[in-house]
């Protein structure tokens, strides 16, 4: 007795099961892994580190665009037989995450400064743990063929240590120094912020001419 075909394409179940099958078969792993006994050092790899999305909630269309583009490049090189690796990860987001955590605490009537540094950092890590899984699930849902066994977080001990070491080396070489500069200052966070973190607001004002 023949089975009736569904009237609509059940993309959620079909694509989820296909993605799981790809992963279980190890198709997202590099074929020339340096840890393998068959490693060929002359076989040049193709590696991309994913621009890590911030752990600030959910992905947006911009993330979907770059994930699709990078996945296209990764799959293209993989199909050519080139050792291919796509390293996934997420970013702690710094001030952006801090602001969201502060807003969440404010709803509970809690102030960051009253909470103290250590307790506040605990709240930040709780936020990361909560939204990290959602973001990773969304990246997987997009079909990203990353090697998830190599996933990193920008505040992982290894990453943090590497950043501190490079920063210290640059400082000792005199390439990092303090000086008087015009900066963007946030009176709420009591810290400097970058240009891309600025939110501009247009206001009507007077235009003065000096005779």
Label every model-predicted segment.
Residues 1-211:
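N-terminal, positively charged nucleic-acid-binding surface of large information/translation enzymes
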